[in-house]
Amino acid sequence: MEIVNNQNQCVPYNCLNNPENEILDIERSNSTVATNIALEISRLLASATPIGGILLGLFDAIWGSIGPSQWDLFLEQIELLIDQKIEEFARNQAISRLEGISSLYGIYTEAFREWEADPTNPALKEEMRTQFNDMNSILVTAIPLFSVQNYQVPFLSVYVQAANLHLSVLRDVSVFGQAWGFDIATINSRYNDLTRLIPIYTDYAVRWYNTGLDRLPRTGGLRNWARFNQFRRELTISVLDIISFFRNYDSRLYPIPTSSQLTREVYTDPVINITDYRVGPSFENIENSAIRSPHLMDFLNNLTIDTDLIRGVHYWAGHRVTSHFTGSSQVITTPQYGITANAEPRRTIAPSTFPGLNLFYRTLSNPFFRRSENITPTLGINVVQGVGFIQPNNAEVLYRSRGTVDSLNELPIDGENSLVGYSHRLSHVTLTRSLYNTNITSLPTFVWTHHSATNTNTINPDIITQIPLVKGFRLGGGTSVIKGPGFTGGDILRRNTIGEFVSLQVNINSPITQRYRLRFRYASSRDARITVAIGGQIRVDMTLEKTMEIGESLTSRTFSYTNFSNPFSFRANPDIIRIAEELPIRGGELYIDKIELILADATFEEEYDLERAQKAVNALFTSTNQLGLKTDVTDYHIDQVSNLVECLSDEFCLDEKRELSEKVKHAKRLSDERNLLQDPNFRGINRQPDRGWRGSTDITIQGGDDVFKENYVTLPGTFDECYPTYLYQKIDESKLKAYTRYELRGYIEDSQDLEIYLIRYNAKHETVNVPGTGSLWPLSAQSPIGKCGEPNRCAPHLEWNPNLDCSCRDGEKCAHHSHHFSLDIDVGCTDLNEDLGVWVIFKIKTQDGYARLGNLEFLEENPLLGEALARVKRAEKKWRDKCEKLEWETNIVYKEAKESVDALFVNSQYDRLQADTNIAMIHAADKRVHSIREAYLPELSVIPGVNAAIFEELEGRIFTAFSLYDARNVIKNGDFNNGLSCWNVKGHVDVEEQNNHRSVLVVPEWEAEVSQEVRVCPGRGYILRVTAYKEGYGEGCVTIHEIEDNTDELKFSNCVEEEVYPNNTVTCNNYTATQEEHEGTYTSRNRGYDEAYESNSSVHASVYEEKSYTDRRRENPCESNRGYGDYTPLPAGYVTKELEYFPETDKVWIEIGETEGTFIVDSVELLLMEE
């Protein structure tokens, strides 16, 4: 059965069934003009219309086709809905302004047509400049008149129409302005107006739409709900739909035609009687049952309708809906709406499966109404008896009977041809059922989606294709669909945890080999990293930077765009796009509206690259005159912007490239000027002793690569934490300002166990673990090596987000939050004489540690005020108090250490040792020297501390003592620190390192022997001194002799009775008594080792105890290991014996052996006596 297109020739229904029928006919007739025009504009803006086509299309659709009476209907549309009359003066003024705009726009479009036909004609170009200026001026003046106080809601539709026209005109000049003869500055200025006004116009419209909706009553019954729903539907079409396209006017975001889709749903009016307050459900009941909650967009497969019978009236009592998501064949079936009934066989309503006809664009409903009477017990009935569902070819699928309540009265078609002119498709049906006293209401509500939202996601090669994410077919767990903010054309997705976002199926309307780029439109209260998987094989990683604060409302200003991704190809047609968030996050929410895809066309890429470079360069500076850098612009970022500029095409934009290059060089110079570090580009390490970088010899400087444009350093791990890999520099006091905060920052490609310090009063410290990114270059990309071997920084590469937070529980080892690091330190009073400065230190003290870093900066951040100022003054005072205490303690320790050192020598020239100075005495004095604190920084023991001068003075004399001692001991390797080197061995012996870190000779067998030939001076006297220990029975012997005779020996035994040794100075009993007397080992002159090394740790407690201001500084356990500081006392049981020997020849032999048990020898000395 065919249905005539003309909505005024519908088949009438029997009005006697409903004699008091009122379906807001007046409001419907008044709103038809506004709705028709708005739908035509939406159709124009949703399609990929060329820019000139939009200009002329707006004239044909509205500004050149309607007069004062139609503008009056625009105003009446909202007047009737909100019951607010516009004063005659305000109405007439608004209509006059609209007429003036229409008239001037007619002249503008005519001038455009003439110029388009002859674009090089100077007179026509001048005429276009004149007409644009006139058009822009009248719109700037008129639009505020449509937002006058108290009439913001009634004027909202015309405000949006005028705003839409203004943005369209501003887009015209940003695209055609140069061809019209405008200079670049003027074009840029008007483009800035365009981007500034888009969010202003958008947010204004959303605000007053919501205000108007909130002013309508949300109580009562069906009539109030119908008026509320009509306002929502008609202003969605005439206001929200149009502002959802405003962002498309940005000619630099959308330089080519763009295809958009409206995924929002609208609800046509109730098709039953709405006047009787006694009939029908409450407002709240209808809103909750008729309006769907946010969901992925679905498409109707069929309706299965149940029919019930009451008092002889058959009616629609319940139904189920089956549908599918975009690109999915999976069938979705709703629960039963209403009740299940069988008064008639169940009816299945399904459109044709033929493409283009597989939808319903129109319904013709047949309502039935009978009022209940209070006098007689008549049952009140308010139901739908039948509906005709009409397809675009006007074929009808009938439920029982068709009626005359026509959905086209609310959602009209464009023109006469419904095949191409329909505006909406039926997507769903809900139902509200109510039983109240003797009244029954069964209200089906038809749900419609805009024709632009097709049932596929088709990507076309010659336009930008926008795909709302609600057109996915599967949501990830944790992803929710939420109500859109009003300007997105539909609902959006939200996620606050990592995981899969959504999956979409796309159809590619081009060869499969074509390459595409994509970008996101989103809002986020945190930084995020999105992974896009194409067909399960291609992976695109994209950074989504924070656009808003947590808890902030979603507005046009909070939504932003990512850059277009690197080019990729689809692997199949159709293909699947899976979107996920994969890196750890902290707090905040991510909202995504849509993705946009564009063919990776060379011309577009060049235009896009130029625009991106221009934005990046301009964003470096605090103002357009490039006088200063923004504080948050890092040196690394400037290098990356420089790469963008260098990669611009010489053929496409040589002049612009040169101009941008000069600006970037200027930015780099400004960055160098504010950087207080010397040699930040690592021209050398250890080049100058008193300035620049100092570092360990295993650090390497490497030239720029695909990450760093300039030199960077690599710090390897170390096998001994007491000898870390380090890099440091001091910021001189003369460069610092009093009471100022400074920041150290830079870029870390990757690191493990990298420690960063800033030291002044105390140490600010952070350990940084930055996971590496692996290769930046995807397998499908061209080689990253240039023709001369240099990194090809213009090749496509994977990106990472430098600002992502990590998420770790307390106690877990965690990656640092960013490849960009920063650490600040506060400076109090400055003193050039004291020259405290700031130490900058990088250190690695683990075997697995490593780091690659560059673009280091140390720069002034801001003056200290308030609490920060008070805190640094407090820290400075504590530091000075502790320095005074340290100075007092140092004076005491220094005096004791100097006395011990002086006692080793015979005079103040320190060129001769005392005759009885032995190795233990030197070690004891050395340990006292090492009790001087703050000789070196605890954080890095190669940096001199406040007591470095006095420490190095005494330490130098200790080294002199060791040298003099070694010079007079004619036995080589007498302390066995070099194993058995220089000794002759017979049998089995060992050199062992005991737990006191001393090497000792162990003779475990009586047949073993160790000997050494020593050259001496005949006739001179020598002292043979041995420190040893005997375990078990028998004796240990150290013998000295010449070839034929002149033999003497020292014997050691673990005995209890007195033994007498020739020429010996000590017996066993004497040794035991002496050992008890001195509570330790014995030497011929010095007290026991333990007493010599005794120190009171409490006296020399750390002077750094500050906790609240900075990290507490701790003692460096490696500091005492410098020189011979690790020499520890002998354990109890060792004894030192000596004898005098006068050789008669120039050679003697030293032999070590034992009779049984084990003989342990600590040291053997043969010392030349003084003359």
UniProtKB/Swiss-Prot annotation:
Listed under GO biological process in this entry are: sporulation resulting in formation of a cellular spore; symbiont-mediated killing of host cell
What keywords does the record list, in alphabetical order?
A: Sporulation, Toxin, Virulence
InterPro entries the record matches: Cry1Ac-like_dom-VII, Cry_V, Galactose-bd-like_sf, Pest_crys, Pest_crys_Cry1Aa_dom-IV, Pest_crys_dom-III, Pest_crys_dom_I, Pest_crys_N_sf
Q: Which CDD domains match?
A: delta_endotoxin_C
Which residue ranges does the record annotate as region Disordered?
Answer: 1094-1124
The superkingdom listed in its UniProt entry is Bacteria
The record's annotation in SUPFAM superfamilies points to: delta-Endotoxin (insectocide), middle domain, delta-Endotoxin (insectocide), N-terminal domain, Galactose-binding domain-like
> GO molecular-function annotation terms?
signaling receptor binding; toxin activity
Biased composition, class Basic and acidic residues, residue ranges: 1103-1117
Q: Which family does it belong to?
A: Belongs to the delta endotoxin family.
Give the protein's function.
Answer: Promotes colloidosmotic lysis by binding to the midgut epithelial cells of many lepidopteran larvae including Spodoptera species.
Other remarks on this protein: Toxic segment of the protein is located in the N-terminus.
User: What is the protein named?
Assistant: Pesticidal crystal protein Cry1Ea
**Which species expresses this protein natively?**
Bacillus thuringiensis subsp. kenyae
Its gene name is cry1Ea
